[in-house]
């Protein structure tokens, strides 16, 4: 429940099929928010829109950009105000088809210990470290697999640097307790 309730308030709507729903639970505590640097990983040109989370992902061209910017500032200038900073809509109690979970008080959401994306990023990072700060074709394919799943653009003509991989870790694992 913490990951769902702490990152939402009653003004956030993560489900376009049910505009009255917030996060699929009956709790929205309005606490944790994204730092500007994280949001800008999805908008490197700095032009970050103030949209609902599902629309932000579409604007970023990356399904992982689940940030609510409606009536919020990008910067976290006042840490005691939830509208100071973008809300994070990464975790919900909605099923993949958009329907609600079984219980709004006790979420159905499972918490993962290891994801395929972690293995792919570990492989790509090791590949780049072995090959002078640039992925080979195999390392590039590993990152492209993650980005294709997120409907984000991929690279075919050149590989990824360690800096690119670090940014990819951020985009994939934010709010999951993993390193950047």
Task: Write out the residue ranges for each language-model feature.
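C-terminal capping/lid segments that line or modulate ligand- or cofactor-binding pockets
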Residues: 5-8, 151-158, 166-180
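Surface-exposed charge patches in extracellular/virion surface proteins
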Residues: 64, 72, 83, 95, ...
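Extended, hydrophobic/aromatic-rich amphipathic alpha-helical segments that build helical scaffolds
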Residues: 1-2, 62, 110-146, 162-176
């Amino acid at each position: 429940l913490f990951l769902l309730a702490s990152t939402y308030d009653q003004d956030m709507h993560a489900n376009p099929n049910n505009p009255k729903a917030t996060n699929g639970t009956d709790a929205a505590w309005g606490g944790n928010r994204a730092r500007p640097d994280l949001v800008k990983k999805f908008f490197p040109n700095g032009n970050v829109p103030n949209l609902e989370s599902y629309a932000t992902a579409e604007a970023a061209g990356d399904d992982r950009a689940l940030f609510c910017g409606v009536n919020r500032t990008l910067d976290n200038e006042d840490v005691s105000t939830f509208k100071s900073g973008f809300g994070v809509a990464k975790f919900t109690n909605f099923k993949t088809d958009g329907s609600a979970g079984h219980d709004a008080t006790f979420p159905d959401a499972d918490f993962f210990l290891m994801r395929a994306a972690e293995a792919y990023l570990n492989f790509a990072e090791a590949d780049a470290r072995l090959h002078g700060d640039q992925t080979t074709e195999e390392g590039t394919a590993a990152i492209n697999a993650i980005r294709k799943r997120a409907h984000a653009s991929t690279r075919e003509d050149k590989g990824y640097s360690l800096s690119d991989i670090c940014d990819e870790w951020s985009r994939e694992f934010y709010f999951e307790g993993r390193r950047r």
